[in-house]
């Protein structure tokens, strides 16, 4: 089945190291991850680490599948939305960070793919925008 890839790039007014720290610290992840109430993991994170994310309406287990400090962080959902992967690429931009967020979804069926593409509540780009706004707020703390 075909995959859907969503990419969002922006500049965040903080150094790469600080952005990477906020993205990868389980204690701050619930601040920027949309609808997350809690994130449970044993820090520090590394490739292969597993995290439990408690959202408003569901729970998910995610596994870190890409970790290259301070430039790359990525995970794959192991429970909940099993076919979703999220990646963050951080690049030096002076005193700021160029941040690219990519969400990749491997649709299990044509019907599932159509639901995600057509259903307003599955507004992936809107969720990515909320994630970035939340991250900006978390960086101000």
Question: Which stretches of residues belong to each language-model region?
Answer:
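Short, surface-exposed coil-to-beta transition loops
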Residues: 5-7, 58-62, 82-87
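Generic structural detector for well-ordered beta-strands
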Residues: 9-13, 40, 52-54, 63, ...
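A short, structured loop/turn motif at beta-sheet edges
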Residues: 13-16, 65-70, 89-98
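Hydrophobic pocket/interface hotspot
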Residues: 19-23, 29, 51, 64, ...
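Short beta-strand segments that buttress and anchor functional surface loops
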Residues: 49-56, 73-79
């Amino acid at each position: 089945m075909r995959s859907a890839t969503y990419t969002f790039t922006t500049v965040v007014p903080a150094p790469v190291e600080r952005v990477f720290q906020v993205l990868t610290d389980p204690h701050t992840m619930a601040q920027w991850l949309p609808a997350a109430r809690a994130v449970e993991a044993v820090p520090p994170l590394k490739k292969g680490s597993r995290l439990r994310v408690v959202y408003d309406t569901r729970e998910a287990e995610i596994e870190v599948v890409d970790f290259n400090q301070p430039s790359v962080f990525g995970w794959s959902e192991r429970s909940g939305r099993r076919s979703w992967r999220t990646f963050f690429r951080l690049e030096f931009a002076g005193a700021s960070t160029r941040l690219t967020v990519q969400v990749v979804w491997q649709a299990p069926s044509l019907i599932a793919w159509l639901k995600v593409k057509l259903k307003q509540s599955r507004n992936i780009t809107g969720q990515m925008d909320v994630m970035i706004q939340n991250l900006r707020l978390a960086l101000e703390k």
